[in-house]
Amino acid sequence: GENEPPKKKAPDGCFGHKIDRIGSHSGLGCNKFKPGH
């Protein structure tokens, strides 16, 4: 619905494509990426 909370985790376990490329070359991955960091 329209009142759904912001998605903190994408279906793939990533936080979106913005950090997707960052995690890919940083080696941080998606699951290890902590929200708010």
Swiss-Prot record:
Function recorded in the entry: Increases urine flow and decreases blood pressure when administered to rats by intravenous injection. Inhibits thrombin-induced platelet aggregation. Stimulates cGMP production via the natriuretic peptide receptor-A (NPR1).
Organs and tissues of expression: Expressed by the venom gland.
Effect of G23R: Does not affect blood pressure or diuresis
Disulfide bond positions: C14-C30
Transmembrane segment boundaries: none
GO biological process: regulation of blood pressure; vasodilation; venom-mediated activation of G protein-coupled signaling in another organism
Locations listed in the record: Secreted
Record keywords: Disulfide bond, Hypotensive agent, Secreted, Toxin, Vasoactive, Vasodilator
Entry's family note: Belongs to the natriuretic peptide family.
GO molecular function: hormone activity; receptor ligand activity; toxin activity
Name of the protein this chain belongs to: Natriuretic peptide PNP
Keyword Thylakoid: no
Record-level GO cellular component terms: extracellular region
Outcome of swapping K18S: Does not affect blood pressure or diuresis
Recorded superkingdom: Eukaryota
